[in-house]
C-alpha cells in the first residue's frame, strides 16, 4: 500500500486538452502491442492529448465521440445511483482504453468516465475507430480481448463491493491505482476515495489508519 496520500481540493469536470497528431508508438500497452499493420490503421488518426484531473471522457447515455488510450494517469468508470451519488465500477490506465461499447458496436456510454489522476495519452474519433475495426478482423479480436478483461475487472469490483470489508476494498483499490501510476503519492482526497468506494468519508479515514498500522 502507498503511504502519505497527498490531499488535493475537489475540482469541477474539465475537458481534455489536445496537443498534436500522434504518429510514433505510444506508451499505452494496447497500442504499443498492436501488429504493425493494425497500428497503421489507427496511427494517422491518433491525437496526442493532455488529460487533466476531472477531464470528462464519457458521459452516461450520451454518444461517444472519442476513444481514449492513456499513456499515464488513471480514469474512473463510475455508475451514478440515487440522489446523484457515484460509485466506481472500473479503472482504466495505460493498460487499456475507454470506449469499450464502441468496440462492441454501440454508440452511447452506459456509465460516466473521467480522469481521477492526471496524465496524458491519445484519442481517436469513435467513427475512425469503427472504420478501422471494420477493416481488420484481427484488430476487432484484439480489442475484444481487452473488453473481456475489463468486464472481469468490473465483475470482481462488484463482488468486492458486495462481500468485502471496507479495509479490503480500500486496499484493493489502492493497489489497482498503484499499478497504473508512478511515484509514491496519490493526489486524492479521502472524500473522493469514499465516493469511488460508495462509503462514508469517515469510513475511509478509519480504514486508512487501520491499513497504515498493519504496515508497520
Which residues fall in each region the model found?
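Short amphipathic alpha-helical elements of helix-turn-helix/winged-helix folds
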Residues: 169, 173-177
Amino acid at each position: 500500500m502507498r503511504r502519505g496520500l497527498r490531499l488535493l481540493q475537489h475540482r469541477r469536470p474539465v475537458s481534455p486538452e489536445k496537443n498534436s497528431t500522434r504518429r510514433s508508438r505510444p506508451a499505452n500497452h494496447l497500442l504499443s502491442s498492436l501488429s504493425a499493420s493494425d497500428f497503421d490503421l489507427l496511427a494517422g488518426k491518433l491525437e496526442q492529448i493532455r488529460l487533466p484531473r476531472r477531464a470528462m471522457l464519457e458521459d452516461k447515455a450520451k454518444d461517444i465521440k472519442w476513444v481514449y488510450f492513456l499513456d499515464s494517469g488513471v480514469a474512473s468508470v463510475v455508475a451514478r445511483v440515487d440522489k446523484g451519488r457515484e460509485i466506481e465500477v472500473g479503472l482504466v490506465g495505460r493498460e487499456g482504453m475507454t470506449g469499450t461499447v464502441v468496440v462492441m458496436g454501440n454508440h452511447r456510454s452506459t456509465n460516466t468516465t473521467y480522469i481521477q489522476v492526471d496524465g496524458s495519452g491519445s484519442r481517436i474519433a469513435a467513427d475512425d475507430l469503427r472504420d478501422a475495426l471494420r477493416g481488420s478482423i484481427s484488430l476487432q479480436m484484439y480489442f475484444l480481448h481487452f473488453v473481456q478483461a475489463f468486464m472481469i475487472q468490473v465483475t470482481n469490483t462488484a463482488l468486492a463491493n458486495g462481500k468485502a470489508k471496507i479495509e479490503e476494498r480500500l486496499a484493493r483499490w489502492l493497489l489497482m491505482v498503484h499499478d497504473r501510476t508512478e511515484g509514491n503519492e496519490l493526489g486524492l482526497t479521502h472524500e473522493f476515495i469514499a465516493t469511488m468506494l460508495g462509503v462514508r468519508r469517515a469510513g475511509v479515514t478509519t480504514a486508512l489508519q487501520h491499513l497504515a498500522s498493519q504496515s508497520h
